[in-house]
Structures are given as structure tokens and as C-alpha cells.
Amino acid sequence: MVKDRVLLTGASGSMGNAAFLELLKRRDKYDIVLLVRPSEKNRKYFTKYLGIKSLGTINKSVNEVNGFKIVWGDLINPDDVFRAVDGCDYVLHPAALISPAADHNPRMAREVNFEGTKNVIAAIRKQQNRGDNTKLVYVGSVAEYGDRLPPIHRIRVGDPIIPSIYDFYATTKIAAERAVIESGLKYWVSIRQTFIGIPKALTLLDPIMFHQPLAQHIELITDKDAGYGLVQCLDAPEGFWGNIYNMSGGPSCRFVYWEYLRNMMNLLGMGDYRRIMDRNWFCLRNFHGGWFEDSYVLDDFLHHWRSNLDDHFTQVKGFRFWYSYLVKVIPKFFVKIYLKRMVMSKNGPLYWIESNNEGRIKAFFGSKKKWKDIPSWEVDGSKFTGEGYLLYHGFDENKLDTELGLEDLKEAARFRGGECLSERFIDMKTKLKWKCAFGHSFEGSPTLVLKGGHWCPDCDAPPWGYDKIAAKNPFFAQVYYANHGNDENYFYGAESFENIL
């Protein structure tokens, strides 16, 4: 029996490793190829699956045993990527440099996330029939949607793509997704992944946890379900391909951030989070997260909704490190000192306040006065009551793709403050000509614009000139004005990451 060959990138990450372990269960159906960086840690971990006992016997570039192949290389090296892609029927591509690492090295994030994805596309194009026999699953991010605090926390595919200010990770994922959608590949999908709840939760203790507003609505997925869903793409039907999806664990995995903090801090032995953290340590806006209104669409294909929020907490409880027990007996005063050191680091909100970092204060709080006005825990202001509302996409979404016409595209362009310059609409994949409100002309398929929420690449961040864009683009303004004033006028430069190094 001839097996399909599957390339998996990012096998050392949370989603990727879960996918790797799931693929191992299906070796009767698939040969496995990994593209893995040749670090000592990776070599020790992955070579045991090759049956190699001594690291000294490992080939420097490629090892292959019984249908399991490891290409030791890097996404940013086109030759390494081609060696991995060559001969594969499927490419599962979750590899990425994520935050907070991406915040500190946005140039490397762009190389890995964007240029690396372009290398994957190019390698597929070099295959037989220009890659028409190879299917690509690209993993995007909920971060592409940007700041979606209530009442706009209900997210759908097709909503505006607006990365939060300073979120360099999101900007690279957006650029990479655009490249995938417009690649011309016959078989592709983009899966916008939500927050992955990992068992080793203490490893997430980082200043970035304070960037998240307490009222943020979030819908997580466990690492096992994320990896399982990724591998399930291998069995997806023809109608699955050529689309964009939101991936999460479903409604049973929804929560509000302050609730998650309460449960997680208790679970980790830290007790009442209000005793170890001050309320004004947390930002008021400018992160990402929401509840996916349409994640059921992907689950209908992949059937990956297997775990709920309680299952996640059970996994965390099972993986608690020894020092989580020690925390229980340490006076909470010392725990608070430890956490305050975190929030006072260069990427921490209190450091921005004390150093008068105008850009960060403006982006994450609105103003220093608004930070000063944050009440104590005694005042209940972190809850949101109400269902929120869905965003308008600028055209009749009740129409099937086959029912859309040129006037629908022109209507959508007008709602974005621009124009559709083309006078002929062929299909959802064929690129058309558009113009944005600032006069930039560009090409993009209806799938990219109407179904993906993308718009003008010249206006894409970085830099972030959102106040001017929102003034001319009603589609964009739906998100931006939900927690920004229409009198704001601020510009955030592309090099603004340097003030947190």
C-alpha cells in the first residue's frame, strides 16, 4: 500500500507537537516528514522516534527510517524547506515565532512567519504539476482580528483584519496568510487559531499576561484538540479546501479573562488573584481575543471539539510543577513582589507608566489619566452583560458565493472607503483591482477581501496609522471606534518595538 506523505512544520511547538503525536498513531496511513531546527534539545527529543540511540550517529541534514523522515533545517532557508516539501502530498504548517518572543525580535518573526511561509509556497510550486497535488494547511491566528473587547467580542471569518498596535506577531501572520490565499495553489486552507491552553501553564508567566484586559472574552482550545484537528485536515473532503476558518474548542471553552485568572491562580496554589495583583497592572485595551461565532464550521469538517474548559483545568492540575505546591506555603506578599517585578519589566505596563512611555500608554490605556482612574478590586467593573453584536461585512452575506456579482464587490469596496476598479467578476479566486481611501491601488481576490477581511496591503501595519484609516473606512471603524475616540490622532512607528528591549 502506497501511503500519503505528510510534512509537519513546528513539531516542537504546542500545536505542532500534539499533531506529531497524533500522526504517529496514523503511521499505517501516512509517512511522516518533519522540518525541525537542529538544536540539541530537538535532536534528543525527535531522534528517539527514529530509533537512534546515539546523537553521534545522526546525519547533519536528513535522517529517514521506515517512512519517518527528519529534515534538520530552518524555515528561513529555502533549500531546507524544499528538501522537506519534496514529494509530500500534504503540508501541515503551524510553525511560527510567537509572542512574546516576536515582540522582542519582530525582524526574526517576519523572517520565520512570513518569509518562511513564502518558502513553503515556493517549494510546493516546484512540485509536479506546479503543486496541484499538494495540499497546504496554514495556521493563522486570532491575533489577526486585533482588539475585540465587548461589545464586539463575537468574531467571524470576514471581520476586519486589524492587528493590535505593537503586535508584530499578528502583522507577520497576516502577511503570511495573504500570501497563502493569493498563492494560486489549488489546495490550501487557512485556520485562524485561538489561544491554545497548554497543561504547563506556569510557563506562560510573562509580562504579556498583563497586556490582556480583564474584560477580554476568550475561547481557548486544548493543545491536544488543536493538534488532532490539524491532522484531521488530512481526511477533509474537496469542499474543505480554498477557505478560511476559525479554530477553537467551541462554546464550552469560553471565558472572560478575569474568570480565568481567578481559576488558574487558585489551581496553581496562588490563591485569590486580587491579593497578589493590583487591578491597574492590567491594560484597558489593545490585545486580542474573542468568542468565535463560526468555529462550528470547522468542527463540522474536523470533529475536533473533544474537550471543554474543565478538561483544560484538569490537564493543568495534572502537570503542575513541584514549585506550585511550594507557592501555597510562601506568604502572598512575596508572590506579589515576584509578579510586580514582572509587570515592572520593560514589556510590563507599570514600567510604561513609570517611564512615561507615551506610545505604550496611549495604545494600551488611552491616556495616563485613564490608568490613574482604574478603580480598586472593590469596584466591580470587569464584567460585561449583554450579547454584543456582529460586525457588518459590507455586502449581503446571505448570498452564496455563486450568487455574488460585481455590484456586491463594489458595495463592499465602498464600505471600506474605496473602490472596486475591475469591471468583470470571474470567480472568488481570480484577483481583481481595488483602490483604498488613500488612493493605493492593489490586487486581491474576492476570497481575500470579502471572505478574509483583508484590504489594502499598503495600509497594513506596521506602522499603525489607525486613526486616519478609521476616519475614512467604515468597515475598519466598526472595530477601532469600539474602544477609541474619533478625536484620537496618533501614529505608531514600525521601529517602536525598540523601547521594550
Labelled PLM ranges:
Residues 76, 104, 108-119, 163, ...:
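Glycine-rich NAD(P)-binding loop of the Rossmann-fold in SDR/ketoreductase-type enzymes
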Residues 97, 118-166, 189:
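Conserved Rossmann-fold NAD(P)-dependent oxidoreductase catalytic core, especially the SDR/UDP-sugar
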Residues 211-235, 242-243:
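Substrate-positioning beta->alpha
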